[in-house]
Swiss-Prot record:
It comes from Dictyostelium discoideum. It comes from the Eukaryota. The gene is cigB. GO terms for molecular function: zinc ion binding. The keyword Repeat applies. Keywords: Repeat. This is FNIP repeat-containing protein cigB. InterPro entries: FNIP, FNIP_repeat, Znf_B-box.
Length: 744
C-alpha cells in the first residue's frame, strides 16, 4: 500500500513538460510557474530566470495558492464554459455541414437525374426518328413488293398456263390461223376454248402493260430514304467541357441566405426564368440581394446613417427591422432574411410597405404581422410558419409560394387573393380548397406534388405553365373556367383533352417544345400567340376555329401554305425570323398588323388580295409600290412608323387612313386621292402644309395632335371636321367657313 502511494505521489510531482523529472523550483519571473531541472537548463524555457527551490519557498507557495484560488481557478471555470460553448457551436456547425452535404448529394443526384433524363429523351427522340424513318421505308418496300408480286402473279399465269409456254400457244394459233386464211372461210371460223383463253390472256396482258404500277413503283423507289446517323463530335466535346462549369463550390458565410427565390415571370414564357438570389456589392458599398429585378439592400447597424439619409426602394433585414420606423421614406419592398428573429407585432412593419418577401424567420407570424398596405407576399424556400386564417391580410392580392415547410390548410390563403404563383420546388398537396375560389390567375413552375382534379379552383380564368413544369395534364386538371392559357417549356407531353375546350386564348411561349398534332389545341381556341417554338408546326397544328394569330418576336417557323389555317381572319406579325412567301398568309385573312420590329420584304403577293385592313408599326424593311395590295381599304400608321410615303406606296384602293405619331414627314401625294376619311390620332406630330390632305378627303378627325395648324392645313373641300375632346390645339380658326365642325 505504501509503495503504491509513493508511486502516486511521485507521479503527481512529475513535470508536465518533462514527465521523467520532478518539480523542484518556482520561477519568480513567471508568476511562480513550477519547473524541473530541464525547464531551467540552458535549453529550457526558464533558463536564466530567478528561481527558488520548492523546499525553501513557503511564502511563494502561499502566493501561488492564493493566485490559484483567486485568479487561475475562476479562469479555468470560464475556460471550461467557453470550451463548452465553442464545442456546441462546432457541433452545430458540423451538423449543418453534414446536413448541407446531404442536401448537396441530393441536389447532385436530382440534377444529374435530370441530365440523364434529358439524355434519355434525346436518345428516345433519335430512336423515334430512326424508327419512323424505318417504318416509312418498310411501307415503301411493302407497297413496291406487293404491287410487283401482284403483277408477277398475273404475268406468270399468262406465261405458264397449264405448264405450256404462252409463246408455243401463240405460235400454234398463228399456224392454224394461216391455214384458215388460206381456206378463206371466215364464216366457218371456229373459236375454241384455247382461243378464248388466249383472248382473255391478251386482255390481262394489255391491262398489266397499261396500268401505271411500274411507273408508280419507280416513283416509290425514289422515296426510299436511307439515312446515316452522325454525331457532331465538336458539339459533344463542347458539351463535355461545359459540364465542368455547371457546378461550383462556394463557402457559406455565417449570415448567408439559405434559400432560393425563383423568378418565373415569361414575358412572353417571357420567357421565365429562374433567378437565384445574388449577393452583390453595389456602388454605394452596401450589400444587396437581387430578386425579381429589385436590388434589396441588406440593412447593417454599423452603417445605419446611410440608410437614414438615403432613399431605398427595397430593403432586406437579417435580425430586426426597427429602423423602418425611423426612415424618412419607407421602401416599397421589404425582405426578411432567413434567421430574422424579431416578433412581428402590429406596426413593426409599418403601413406603406407594398411588397413583403419572407424567408426562414424564427418568430411566429400573428394577425397584423403583415400590414394591410401589402399587396404582394412571397414565402420563400425554408419558410416554416403556420399560416392560419388572417395571417395573410385581405389586402394582399398576389402570393408567391416556394418550398415552404408547413402544410397549407383551407383558409391559409385568403379568398381575396387574385393571383397565386407556385414557384419551382413548391411541395404541397393541393387538395380542393387550398387555393381558394377567389383566385383568378395561377402561375405554376416545377412543383413537386401531383396536380389532381380540383387542385385548381373553378374561379381561375388564366393559367400560366412556366418553364420546367413537369405534371401530366389529364382531362379535368385544368378546369373549364380557364379561358386563357400560357405554356412555356413544359416537360410532360400534351395530349388531347389536356387543354379544355373552354380555353379561347393560348400563348405558346419561347422554348415551347411539344409536337402540336391535330386536336392538341382544341377547337374552342379563337386567339393564338406563338413565340420561338422548338418543334415544327404542321398542317392542322392550328385548328380552323382560330380567328386571330399573333406571331411574336423570335418566331422561327417556315410558313408554307396551310400552316396558318383558312379560318384565321386577323394576323399580327412581329420580328419573325423566317421569310414570308406567297401563300404564307391565307386568303381568309382580312386584317394584317405588322408590328414594331417586323423585318420582312413585302414584295407583291405576300399580303394577299383579300386583306382589307392593314396596320403598320415601326417596320424595318422599306415599303415599295405593290407592297400593299390594291384591295386594302383601310390603313393605320401606328406610333413609330418610320417610312417615307412617296406616291403609290399607299394604293388608290384605300378609303380610310388613320395616322398616329409617325416619324417621317408627310408630303404631297403621301395620301392618295381615293382616301375620303383621314383620322389624325393622339400624338400625331407632322406639319400639315397645303396639299398634304388631298381635296378628295371629305371627313377629317383630329385628336391630340402636337403640331400647330396653319392656314390651308385643312382643305375647303372637306364636308366635316371632327374635333375630339383630347385635342388641345387651336383648331377652329383654321377650319374653312364652309366646313362643318363636329365636337366629339
Amino acid at each position: 500500500m505504501k509503495e503504491s502511494e509513493d508511486i502516486i505521489i511521485n507521479n503527481q510531482n512529475r513535470c508536465t513538460l518533462h514527465p521523467n523529472k520532478n518539480l523542484e523550483f518556482l520561477c519568480l519571473d513567471c508568476k511562480f510557474m513550477p519547473c524541473c531541472s530541464l525547464c531551467t537548463s540552458r535549453k529550457g524555457e526558464h533558463h536564466g530566470h530567478k528561481t527558488d527551490s520548492l523546499e525553501s519557498s513557503a511564502s511563494n507557495i502561499h502566493s501561488l495558492i492564493n493566485d490559484f484560488k483567486d485568479n487561475i481557478y475562476p479562469k479555468l471555470i470560464e475556460r471550461k464554459e467557453n470550451d463548452q460553448i465553442l464545442l456546441k457551436e462546432s457541433n452545430e456547425t458540423f451538423k449543418e455541414i453534414q446536413s448541407q452535404n446531404d442536401d448537396n448529394n441530393n441536389l447532385l443526384k436530382n440534377e444529374f437525374k435530370q441530365i440523364h433524363n434529358i439524355l434519355s429523351f434525346v436518345e428516345l427522340d433519335i430512336e423515334k426518328q430512326l424508327s419512323t424513318n424505318l417504318d416509312q421505308n418498310i411501307l415503301i418496300n411493302t407497297i413496291i413488293t406487293s404491287s410487283i408480286n401482284n403483277d408477277n402473279k398475273i404475268i406468270s399465269t399468262i406465261l405458264n398456263n397449264n405448264n405450256n409456254s404462252i409463246i408455243d400457244k401463240l405460235n400454234y394459233f398463228t399456224q392454224i390461223n394461216n391455214q384458215q386464211d388460206n381456206d378463206d372461210n371466215d364464216d366457218c371460223y371456229q373459236i375454241d376454248t384455247d382461243t378464248i383463253e388466249l383472248i382473255k390472256q391478251y386482255q390481262n396482258s394489255l391491262l398489266i402493260l397499261k396500268n401505271s404500277n411500274n411507273i408508280n413503283n419507280l416513283t416509290k423507289l425514289k422515296e426510299y430514304n436511307n439515312q446515316i446517323l452522325k454525331f457532331d463530335n465538336q458539339t459533344i466535346n463542347n458539351i463535355k467541357n461545359s459540364f465542368k462549369s455547371i457546378y461550383s463550390f462556394g463557402d457559406i458565410p455565417n449570415d448567408a441566405i439559405d434559400y432560393n427565390i425563383n423568378n418565373n415571370n415569361n414575358n412572353n414564357n417571357n420567357n421565365n426564368n429562374n433567378n437565384n438570389n445574388e449577393l452583390n456589392n453595389s456602388n454605394n458599398k452596401n450589400e444587396f440581394i437581387k430578386i425579381l429585378n429589385h436590388n434589396f439592400y441588406i440593412y447593417s447597424e454599423s452603417d445605419e446613417s446611410s440608410f437614414l439619409t438615403d432613399d431605398f426602394e427595397s430593403l432586406a433585414f437579417k435580425d430586426n427591422c426597427n429602423i423602418l420606423s425611423k426612415l424618412k421614406k419607407l421602401p416599397n419592398n421589404v425582405l426578411l432574411l432567413s434567421g430574422f428573429n424579431q416578433k412581428l407585432t402590429k406596426g413593426i412593419i409599418p403601413e406603406g410597405v407594398k411588397v413583403l418577401y419572407i424567408g426562414d424567420i424564427k418568430q411566429e407570424l400573428i394577425i397584423d404581422s403583415i400590414p394591410n398596405t401589402v399587396t404582394t407576399v412571397g414565402l420563400w424556400y425554408g419558410f416554416n410558419q403556420k399560416l392560419t386564417k388572417g395571417i395573410i391580410p385581405e389586402g394582399v392580392k398576389e402570393l408567391r409560394l416556394g418550398d415552404i415547410k408547413q402544410e397549407l390548410i383551407i383558409d391559409s390563403i385568403p379568398s381575396t387573393l387574385t393571383t397565386v404563383i407556385l414557384c419551382d420546388g413548391f411541395n404541397q398537396k393541393l387538395t380542393k380548397g387550398i387555393i381558394p375560389e377567389g383566385v383568378k390567375v395561377l402561375y405554376i413552375g416545377d412543383i413537386k406534388q401531383e396536380l389532381i382534379i380540383d387542385s385548381i379552383p373553378n374561379t381561375v380564368t388564366r393559367v400560366r405553365l412556366l418553364d420546367g413544369f413537369n405534371q401530366k395534364l389529364t382531362k379535368g386538371i385544368i378546369p373549364e373556367s380557364v379561358k386563357e392559357l400560357h405554356i412555356g417549356n413544359i416537360k410532360q407531353e400534351l395530349i388531347i383533352d389536356s387543354i379544355p375546350n373552354t380555353v379561347t386564348t393560348i400563348t405558346l411561349c419561347d422554348g415551347f417544345n411539344q409536337k402540336l398534332t391535330k386536336g392538341i389545341i382544341p377547337e374552342g381556341v379563337k386567339e393564338l400567340y406563338i413565340g420561338n417554338l422548338k418543334q415544327e408546326l404542321i398542317i392542322d397544328s392550328i385548328p380552323n376555329t382560330v380567328t386571330t394569330v399573333r406571331l411574336c418576336d423570335g418566331f422561327n417557323q417556315k410558313l408554307t401554305k396551310g400552316i396558318i389555317p383558312e379560318g384565321v381572319k386577323e394576323l399580327y406579325i412581329r420580328d419573325i425570323k423566317q421569310e414570308l412567301i406567297i401563300d404564307s398568309i391565307p386568303n381568309t385573312v382580312t386584317t394584317v398588323i405588322l408590328c414594331d420590329g417586323f423585318n420582312q420584304k413585302l414584295t407583291k403577293g405576300i399580303i394577299p388580295e383579300w386583306v382589307k385592313g392593314l396596320c403598320l408599326g415601326d417596320i424595318k424593311q422599306e415599303l415599295i409600290i405593290d407592297s400593299i395590295p390594291n384591295t386594302v381599304t383601310t390603313v393605320r400608321l401606328l406610333d413609330g412608323f418610320n417610312q417615307k410615303l412617296t406616291k403609290g406606296i399607299i394604293p388608290e384602293s384605300v378609303k380610310e387612313l388613320y395616322i398616329d405619331d409617325i416619324k417621317q414627314e408627310l408630303i404631297i401625294d403621301s395620301i392618295p386621292n381615293t382616301v375620303t376619311t383621314v383620322r389624325l390620332l393622339d400624338g400625331f406630330n407632322q406639319k400639315l402644309t397645303k396639299g398634304i390632305i388631298p381635296e378628295w378627303v371629305k371627313e377629317l378627325h383630329i385628336g391630340d395632335i402636337k403640331q400647330e395648324l396653319i392656314i390651308d392645313s385643312i382643305p375647303n373641300t372637306l364636308n366635316n371636321v371632327y374635333i375630339y375632346k383630347s385635342c388641345k390645339k387651336l383648331i377652329y380658326s383654321f377650319v374653312p367657313v364652309n366646313v362643318k365642325i363636329v365636337n366629339i
